[in-house]
């Protein structure tokens, strides 16, 4: 299967030696224990002399990683049959400051500033498995404004500052590669402005399901709330007002491999400064009158159950990243080259796809 996938995703590489090195590197990512460095891969394949050649292939060669990603995306379109594209941000801690994109960044999930790279991946996902396809580096001011002498050069089109810019650009590009009707984009970007997110994906013609803070200001529309004065209120407060509409929805937890049940309710809303009809979806998991999580989506005609299960695909991706991506070297690139980071990440994404396709089905879903 590895040779077949290599023939597919490397078909557009112009030189046979590039295709051969691509397969060698991919084999190393799948078989080397520990850190997946170029040195360790070269040693494992039994050709220490290949280290310099592989280093050049990743960090200094001219092959276009987007060509390989596009082929990988089309492969996953057939093999995964994704229900959505899922955005997955990744924080990669770094000790130094000279690797591309590295800088001090506040990480909300950790509650502290971390010297790190911040990457955003877009994944093809269904309920059973998922695989990364397209990637962006989210760059801080130091990289976008005036990189210091000796810093890696970043092409201007890649100078995205926010997770939203990275996510939207990568998702639109991926959809263009695979074609067909636009798939929903599932996002959980705590620092993204919900109104800006809605406008960005509306402009791209791509539906979305986005986790939002309970403090998000929304305005109910239509007859859903009798007696409401039509002014904006918080998402949490509005969902609490419609909690009597809740229905039970089942979904599969990809971590525990068990069937879970949540109570959900939805209400048509608008965001400040927008007129596009949206649905605000809330999830309750206990007896509390306040929702545990909430999402906004422009899939206003989709029933609440399928909408919640779309949102839960982010858990599928998180589980696969932890169990598979970290084991095939996704965060192991040690070089300073912008192109090197993208080429390594592209090949690690292919290694992830192979691993997931051949893991026992019982690990992907309960019997």
Task: Place the predicted regions along the sequence by residue.
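Electropositive, glycine- and tryptophan-enriched low-complexity nucleic-acid-binding patches
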Residues: 56, 110-181, 291-292
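Domain-level cores of phosphate- or acyl-group-handling catalytic modules
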Residues: 152-221
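Short, conserved catalytic/metal-binding motifs centered on acidic residues
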Residues: 41, 84-93, 122, 183-192, ...
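Short amphipathic alpha-helical "interface-anchor" segments enriched in bulky aromatics
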Residues: 301-335
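An anionic, glycine-rich sequence signature occurring as long contiguous blocks
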Residues: 143, 209-314
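Active-site-proximal, Lys/Arg-enriched surface segment
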Residues: 62-141
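A short, flexible helix-boundary coil/loop motif
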Residues: 1-2, 9-18, 139, 228-270, ...
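Gly/serine-rich nucleotide phosphate-binding loop at the start of the catalytic core
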Residues: 1-56
